[in-house]
């Protein structure tokens, strides 16, 4: 349902939260006759062999979710104590560019 709603806004790209949701979105797009990457580009915020082996292979961003959660928890605890928190936090990531985002 979320994919159908997103398509109504005619986005350039759909970014999914994990590999399972990404594969579900790809199936729905295929059922609706939407071509990836010709009509829309698709990427995931989690990488897996299933994404690399899908057709088309799906672009993915890999990051340390544990480090993200740890930093978010630290920030929340600081805020709850009334202390100033960082407004900008940078964490490392790696992008695996694949067929689903090529134009």
Q: Where are the predicted features?
A:
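Flexible loop/turn connectors
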Residues: 4-103
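Helix-loop module immediately N-terminal to the HCX5R catalytic loop
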Residues: 1
